[in-house]
Amino acid sequence: MIHEAPQVTVSVVDGPCIAGGFGMACAADILITMESSYFKLSETKLGLIPSQISPYLLNRMTFSKARQLMLLGDDLDGSTAHSIGVADYLAHSYEDLYKVISQIKSKVMLCSPNAIAKTKSHLSKARNIDIQRSSQLFFECINHDEGLEGLQSFFEKRDPYWAKSK
């Protein structure tokens, strides 16, 4: 698991970051996004629940904002993701991106690997992330009729039966 790695982990988002990819990006210690990127949680539109990734999302934004994104499937652009705390750094160009990565690398190289590992372990326990419960909720949804329909409609490139047109 990304969040359990003893090293500092960095996610770079350059383009669409949707559903589980959004959660994986949020699981990293540091998240850098390009201004042109966008983030989206589409699970509820597929009859699923973003439960397995919710602990990581809740570590990066307010509960209220996470609830809105999870329930409605709204998009966040890179700038908004940065302004609400999803992303730690916002890069406007690849030159900016490489500068930020270089700065982070330089800072990490000054830190004790053991101290980083112990700090990460301590922070994880302090947040009490219940991945097993989150996984169980996802399993329940994916095995429900609506979860199966949502996945089938996704692969068939059509709306699920409950999606009403505007």
Describe the residue ranges of each PLM region.
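Glycine-rich beta-to-alpha active-site loop
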Residues: 1-46, 75
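Short helix- or helix-capping micro-motifs
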Residues: 65-74
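Acidic, divalent-metal-coordinating active-site segment for phosphoryl/phosphodiester hydrolysis
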Residues: 74-80
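Short, basic/aromatic-enriched C-terminal tail that caps enzymatic domains
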Residues: 150-166
